[in-house]
Amino acid sequence: MEQHFYIKWMRKEERIMRIAFLTLGCKVNSYETDKMKNKFMEAGDYIVSFEEEADIYLVNTCTVTNIADRKSRQMLHRAKKKNPQALIVATGCYVDSALAKDEQDESVDLFVPNDQKNAIVTLVKQAWQQNVADAVQSENGVSIEEKVWQISGEETGRVGGGESLMAQEEEHTRAYLTVQNGCNLYCSYCIIPYVRGPLTSKPIPQVVQELKQMAAKGIREVVLTGIHLSSYGVDDRKASSFLELKG
């Protein structure tokens, strides 16, 4: 069943943003992408498939190998080709590994390093407003555009609300939870410590809180993940153990 939502706006930056995400690389990236999606939904934006037309394409990149670098570039270029007027956002480890070179890539409009992912909504909206500061011009030059999004009833109960997307997440019974980030080993062959920074562990009370939130959404299986998971707790010199979570 199709629901038709009529959206009229005076300026492009005032309307609901349709944002498409693509995640490359590790499960930590997957977790962080989910967190970013939630932030945009809370801000009232609408998440669409990467294969759909979107206002913003956000690629959470990887740099662990040369192949990962190439894949990251390919996906960013594909997004730009899909919609040349869209805002193309690159974040993730590939951005941190080659930012100076990345900035010469005309396919990408905004680069967000890993340590700025928490501010992703603010950064993207600022770039969006700057990118489309001029009023939308229709073919006849009128600065008012009316468009119809055709969205299936299963996809949303309210455009941009995010409630139904959360409900879709609740239908899944497995989720990833990042409890550790970074690495202090600096192996000669590995770039990860340089793009993910030093070892940090999420405090156990925070882990427990997130686990409870996931359980409340119907998640039955949680996979703990990290960049160097076996080093969890070493950074606070307490060597905290996941056994503390038992019970």
Map each language-model feature to its residues.
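Proteins enriched for Cys/Gly/acidic motifs involved in redox and nucleic-acid/cofactor modification
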Residues: 3-6, 10-233, 241-243
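S-adenosylmethionine
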Residues: 236
